[in-house]
Amino acid sequence: MGNKQTIFTEEQLDNYQDCTFFNKKDILKLHSRFYELAPNLVPMDYRKSPIVHVPMSLIIQMPELRENPFKERIVAAFSEDGEGNLTFNDFVDMFSVLCESAPRELKANYAFKIYDFNTDNFICKEDLELTLARLTKSELDEEEVVLVCDKVIEEADLDGDGKLGFADFEDMIAKAPDFLSTFHIRI
């Protein structure tokens, strides 16, 4: 008549704890959140490691993401299937990277992926324009957008190639004191 959870094996829970910044209680809470997204799709028993993909369209409706202008980009950055659908492992990874205790370097890596719209491993002027459009809801005129993008590249482009590589981006993030406090969501 115990109160023992039967969603995961102890080994699975230990593995999640080893690979994330979460404890057992957090993992079970994440499963509950994942289950709530698609109760007809997500099983209550993960002991046999089922592979279930919850569609991006459901994930971006979560309160933590719903109003975020980068919600699709965030989910896509953690999706292993390339379509933006998340398995439970992907879902846990997303919350782990975006939790308060994740290190700056890990967060910077995923932030870079989110802002690299054309996936060329650089943040170019076009990526910055798309970022600005989302952040300002396209309220800046074309001249203002060009000015801001040029200024960002001028200040952050350490090697002078006209675009931001990961090292440039990481250096820029290191100078942004609010990056860690804004690049997170709570479970």
Swiss-Prot record:
Binding, Ca(2+) 1: 116, 118, 120, 127
Disulfide bonds: none
Residues annotated as binding Ca(2+) 2: 157, 159, 161, 163, 168
GO biological process, one term: calcium ion homeostasis
InterPro entries listed in its UniProt record: CIBP (IPR051433), EF-hand-dom_pair (IPR011992), EF_Hand_1_Ca_BS (IPR018247), EF_hand_dom (IPR002048)
Domain (EF-hand): residue spans on this chain: 66-101, 103-138, 144-179
KW Cell wall biogenesis/degradation (keyword) present: no
Resulting phenotype, residue 123 to T: In DFNB48; stimulates the ability to decrease ATP-induced calcium release; decreases interaction with TMC1 and TMC2
Keywords recorded for this protein, A-Z: Calcium, Cell membrane, Cell projection, Cilium, Cytoplasm, Deafness, Disease variant, Magnesium, Membrane, Metal-binding, Non-syndromic deafness, Repeat, Retinitis pigmentosa, Usher syndrome
Outcome following mutation: residue 186 to W: In DFNB48; inhibits the ability to decrease ATP-induced calcium release; decreases interaction with TMC1 and TMC2; does not affect the localization in the cuticular plate or to the tip of stereocilia; does not affect binding with WHRN
Gene3D superfamilies: EF-hand (1.10.238.10)
The organism's place on the tree of life at top rank: Eukaryota
SUPFAM superfamilies reported for this sequence: EF-hand
Function: Calcium- and integrin-binding protein that plays a role in intracellular calcium homeostasis. Acts as an auxiliary subunit of the sensory mechanoelectrical transduction (MET) channel in hair cells. Essential for mechanoelectrical transduction (MET) currents in auditory hair cells and thereby required for hearing. Regulates the function of hair cell mechanotransduction by controlling the distribution of transmembrane channel-like proteins TMC1 and TMC2, and by regulating the function of the MET channels in hair cells.
Disease implicated: Deafness, autosomal recessive, 48: A form of non-syndromic sensorineural hearing loss. Sensorineural deafness results from damage to the neural receptors of the inner ear, the nerve pathways to the brain, or the area of the brain that receives sound information. DFNB48 patients have prelingual onset of severe to profound sensorineural hearing loss affecting all frequencies. Usher syndrome 1J: USH is a genetically heterogeneous condition characterized by the association of retinitis pigmentosa with sensorineural deafness. Age at onset and differences in auditory and vestibular function distinguish Usher syndrome type 1 (USH1), Usher syndrome type 2 (USH2) and Usher syndrome type 3 (USH3). USH1 is characterized by profound congenital sensorineural deafness, absent vestibular function and prepubertal onset of progressive retinitis pigmentosa leading to blindness.
Protein name: Calcium and integrin-binding family member 2
Gene name per UniProt: CIB2
